[in-house]
Amino acid sequence: MNIKKKLSKALTNTVQFFANELSQSATDRDGEKKTVTPGMPELLRRAAADGAVMLENNGILPLEGGTRVALFGITGYESHYVGYGSGGDVNRPYAVSFADGIKNCDRLTLDPTIESIYREWNKKNPINNGFWGHWPFYFPEMPLDNTAVENARNKNEVAVAVIGRAAGESRDCKLQKGSYYLADDEIAMLDALAEEFDNIVILLNIGGIFDMSWIEKYKKVIGAILIVWQ
């Protein structure tokens, strides 16, 4: 191996070490001081609302005050917060999930039973967020109990289903289920909801390309679809 190849290999190994071993998610930053710039949370909330893309609305949005909401999907409780990659893989000071956001909204009521079921599942099946270039493309879904879904239908006006994806630098989207396409467990979740609910709001917690052909299958029960980004 000549000197140029040796130098190139050494440089590559060094870059990979710092990228993979010393990325934000792989280093221990618990002891570091995390600050919140005054006014920034309010600005980001406005930016998130203004940046949401409504793909479909069959008259269900905006939800009326007092609407009772059953929130489904692991990502509704363990959300994707970053854009992934050098500029997006951030060490956030705090995070607000979709479930937390609904509970913070005084106009809506989150179904506590469904929330409890998901919270308990997440405790027993904690999410592995991976590390640089090895983030999970999606969070595997919890199998839904048909009786729980039926009970939720009887107590709530609308079901909200959150579907999330992770893709970015060093972790490109793949043409496979659980990445570009819906995973089988996500299809099972939507099938269960479609059996009981007449209005389902779909929130897409994504930051890149995503197959949307599945909309045709559920068009009779989809009340709205929003891309809410990450």
Segments and roles (model prediction):
Residues 1-230:
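C-terminal non-catalytic regions of proteins with extracellular/luminal or membrane-system context
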